[in-house]
Amino acid sequence: MPKYEIMTILDPKAEMAIIDNLLKTVFGDNSTEKLRKLETTNLAYPIRKSKIAQYFLVELNAPTNLIEEFVRRANITREIWRYLIVNLDSEKGLNKKPKIRERNRKYTPRRDRFDKPNFRGNPKSRFDQQDQQATKNQQNFQQNQQNQTSQYRENSRQNQDDFQQVSSNQQNFRQNQQNQSGYHRENNRQNQENIHQNNKNHQNQTSQTQRSRRQYQPIKNPKFNQKEKENYNNKKPQSSN
């Protein structure tokens, strides 16, 4: 079973029980025997506007599927900011300090002033070149991942803004339709009232005209005698010749 070393960075306000419970849940109760808190608290760059955090280091033996489960749970735990998993069977651990090698000071004779200096650099071995190329490839890969992540976030934000704009336009369109419907209903009601009022006025005028006609119409009395007719004719103004 491979041996792993897990470094976790927690929120400075979080408790140690969070990482302790996570390790026990994934790897078992005996997984926290070598769990220890490091003295380092400073961050190389701010995380969530904080420059300090808690560092925890643990060594354990676990299969690959449990490591994947730990990664999944760590990603959904808000208090865990960062984590790093090192396979000690293939890589050097984080708590292993390099040995200080003593350099033998060799006596180099003083160069004569007439000798030409040797400006040729030290030739690099094939393994050093491969290590440098691997480091460069890893840096390029990390840079590409960061660029893709930033591009994905930017596209997501742009899509969210577009969705909000479309929703706002739909709401405005529905509001305009409601306003237009209300305006048309009000106009139709007003027109109907005007038509009704005009009809009523026309009826009043017609009835008034009929009453005036009946008032000034001469009375035709069949029993109108001759004497009254003469009196009526005498009252008429005489036309001048």
Swiss-Prot record:
What NCBIfam families does the entry give?
S6 (TIGR00166)
CDD domains tied to this protein: bS6
What is the name of the protein in this document?
Answer: Small ribosomal subunit protein bS6
Q: Where is the composition biased (Basic residues)?
A: 97-108
Q: Where is the composition biased (Basic and acidic residues)?
A: 109-118
Where are the stretches annotated Disordered? 97-187, 199-241
Keywords of this protein's UniProt record, alphabetized?
Answer: Ribonucleoprotein, Ribosomal protein, RNA-binding, rRNA-binding
Query: What is a GO molecular function of this protein?
Result: structural constituent of ribosome
What is the source species? Mesomycoplasma hyopneumoniae (strain 7448)
- Output a single Gene Ontology CC term carried by this record: ribonucleoprotein complex
Q: What SUPFAM superfamilies does its record include?
A: Ribosomal protein S6 (SSF54995)
Q: Where along the sequence do coiled-coil regions lie?
A: none
Q: Which HAMAP family match?
A: Ribosomal_bS6
Annotated function: Binds together with bS18 to 16S ribosomal RNA.
Gene Ontology BP term (one) = translation
Task: Provide the gene name from the record.
Answer: rpsF
Q: Where is the composition biased (Low complexity)?
A: 130-151, 161-180, 199-210
Family under the similarity heading: Belongs to the bacterial ribosomal protein bS6 family.
